[in-house]
Amino acid sequence: MLTYAQAGVDEEKTAKALRAIIDAARRTFKFRMNKIGEPGDIGHYSALLDFKDFYLAITTDGVGTKILVAEAVNKFDTIGIDMIAMNVNDLICVGAEPVALVDYLAVKEPNEDVFQQIAKGLYEGAKEAGIAIVGGETAVMPDLINGYDLAGTAVGIVEKDKVVTGEKIKPDDIVIGISSSGIHSNGLTLARKLLIPKYGLDYEYNGKKLWEWLLEPTRIYVKPILKLINEVEVHGLAHITGGGLLNLKRLTKYGFELEMPPIDGIFKLIYENGVPLEEMFRVFNMGVGFMVIVPQEEKENALQILNKYYESFELGKVIKEPEKIKVKNYGITL
């Protein structure tokens, strides 16, 4: 049995340590009070800055330890997609259209071939997301870093009457799940430490090598979500990343009653190697990379739109019971 904390990522410890930084950040809000760019609160997927007629949304994220798998097999051509995805999927959670991104690449030493591979993924990700990469920073730090780290900061725009924060969510709203492409870019530390020592990266599982399962690019949900919010009343949007289903708690005080898909693919291999069921749903997306909350009368319209892009399905509903996430078909509550 192995948990995320035992693998080295203790989220409770991290949250506790972050309090000082978050408190300091909130104290800086006064520097923009009653000025262009006055910020809202911290805690949603993207921060919203007030620009009178619209909000500027801003977020930052990285690839994480997925890049260690890329380094191990010398295949870096998709991690740029992951970095773009992790940022733009957070922007659309507030209804924002992604506009621009700057990247941050830290390396021990520059490698032209690796940089070309990363650039390929960045371009493909930007193309799918409809975003411009307008700058960045490459830091060569042989005394500090061993290998590579890739992150980015993205901005988007949303009209004030189109912003989605979750405040409209109410009991009996319908939760729709959009399928993931696999593990995406979260929980890789746990997956790597659990599976690679036992099987090796070339282990064949259900027709693919382990490294292929781990490097499958994160799905980009920009096109279906922007289409959806222009045609359907949407009450909430959730990118299922670090924290798994707990991400739903960012949106509302209400709880959720869900039936999740069968455990399959890379998640089945991880689960069969001893990760507790509750931990699986706290760490991984479990086959659902994005969730949409809509009123009951919009369910069919939403499903029709979303299924034109990726497999989408009704997962359950919002319940009055506060802050409980019940996964009925697995008998767990988070």
From Swiss-Prot:
Pfam families: AIRS, AIRS_C. Pathway: Purine metabolism; IMP biosynthesis via de novo pathway; 5-amino-1-(5-phospho-D-ribosyl)imidazole from N(2)-formyl-N(1)-(5-phospho-D-ribosyl)glycinamide: step 2/2. Its EC number is 6.3.3.1. It comes from Pyrococcus horikoshii (strain ATCC 700860 / DSM 12428 / JCM 9974 / NBRC 100139 / OT-3). The keyword Cytoplasm applies. Keywords: ATP-binding, Cytoplasm, Ligase, Nucleotide-binding, Purine biosynthesis. CDD domains: PurM. This is Phosphoribosylformylglycinamidine cyclo-ligase. It is found in: Cytoplasm. It catalyses: 2-formamido-N(1)-(5-O-phospho-beta-D-ribosyl)acetamidine + ATP = 5-amino-1-(5-phospho-beta-D-ribosyl)imidazole + ADP + phosphate + H(+). It is an enzyme of class 6 (ligase). It comes from the Archaea. One of its GO terms (biological process) is 'de novo' IMP biosynthetic process. One of its GO terms (cellular component) is cytosol. InterPro entries: PurM-like_C_dom, PurM-like_C_sf, PurM-like_N, PurM-like_N_sf, PurM_cligase. Belongs to the AIR synthase family.
